Amino acid sequence: MKKLTDYMAEELSAAFEKAGYDSSYGKVGVSNRPDLCEYQCNGAMAGAKAYKKAPFMIADDVVGNLADSKVFSMKEMVKPGFINLKVSEEFLADYLKEMEKDEKLGADTAKEPKTIVIDYGGPNVAKPLHVGHLRSAIIGESIKRIGRFVGHKVIGDVHLGDWGLQMGLIITELKYRQPELVYFDDSYTGEYPAEAPFTISELEEIYPCASGKSKEDEAYRQEALEATHLLQQGKPGYMALWNHIMSVSVTDLKRNYANLNVSFDLWKKESDAQPYIPDMVEMMKEKGFAYEDQGALVVDVKEETDTKEIPPCMLLKSDGASLYTTTDLATIVERMKLFQPDEILYVVDKRQELHFIQVFRCARKTGLVKEDTRLSFLGFGTMNGKDGKPFKTREGGVMRLENLIADIDEEMFTKIVENRSVRDKDARDTAKIVGLAAIKYGDLSNQATKDYIFDVDRFTSFEGNTGPYILYTIVRIKSILNRYVEAGGNLEAGEILPASNGSEKNLMLQLSGFGSMIESAFEEKAPHKICAYIYEVSNAFNSFYHETKILSEENQAQKESYIRLLQLTKRVLETSIDLLGFEAPDKM
């Protein structure tokens, strides 16, 4: 479906051409002076030099050719040569009627759908999710949803960290605590127990204990390193323990991610990439990409245009051990083999930028990806407390993600009960829905690359640019529609009529921008654009609501038009929040 601005640009381009100028000057954009006009064309300013003519004279010629246009209700030249435009109420109403019929509400579906793998989430197993895991999960989830909405095949991969020293630490600590377990008996040849010798809460206590010991006791650390090495060599007892650790951890991770309304298509792990490493390293050596430097195996990735030093990409340490770079490169090999993606996008902390520059350059230089495969990195900023430092508990520790969610839910529950609009038995469920919106919108409304302050009081407010405010707007629309139906109204009756007042036209204009906004949000990997858009739509609707007697409107055709407009507004808002990864309750 064409954008509203496409129709306008067609009119302007034809008017430029008819006046003897190049049609390419007919581009139209949203006005930066809404007090003067809704849209503007600056083509006359751009064309003045080429035609050696004053821009206001060019603009005058063009405006003269728009006299019979049905698209514009206002078209005027403003010196030094701007063309100010207002769309006609009739044309705008017709455009919204087309939007109503369109499954995608005016957003274009990709003409050439791409296969995109998004690497997000990325927690280490055997450790609880904490607030530092929040951003990758919810930004990646939103980008995945937006990509699918515009027609691409998007594959979400959690990419678990399961193959590093933390495994050796857990195995070593278990051996100290329960040396009698069969996993540590080298002579044991039977089947290993089906049930894990620990619960998730015990596992989450074992790791920090072992990590602390390894920092104080070098002999303990060496044992853990040896256990890691034996695991990676495939020692049966250790592999059985690793399977238990994975099973218990992944079950808990899935529960926590479900509470965030985040899901993954793949639960791939670092260990899945290990089989690809030997052949990959051998290829890089044979083709002369990899060489030894102080015992380590590296690949040069610096480029002449670099403005800062980019160190070589290290493949193997001097003891032959692999690193994160090795695993990430092998994972690219695996993804190319399994999915042949057009793009692989990593949603990770921006402090990992250098790592991914090295990995991407190494993958390209050594031919791990096709020339047209896009490798991209969305580095997000830090979630900080009100003090501007990384978000912590009141005691100064790292806050678990489930505790943050519980705190926000409790805050929302208190506010909803105070509001008394929902019965107590429903208030808990509503608080969870609204609490999740508060968290996700609070994060996603910020540009991903920037640090932001996680302000619980502001994020849980029903006023201002917040998730609860957006949901309150949707619930308000639902309530009006329910009352209309209860009074015998038919939601399918009538059609959207031309706007009868300024606030109604402003709402219609905001709705008409959905398609352009979605395409921009996907191209720029920018969920914050959806947040900014639905905040404007919500404000426009609430202004319209306060200025318009909707249900008490006596003219039946006008009332039906309002109801159709409300349904479209609800659909646009609900589609948008689904792309952000949350939903609206029926009451709040």
Give the location of each predicted region:
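Short, charged, solvent-exposed linker or helix-capping segments at domain edges/interfaces
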Residues: 94-99
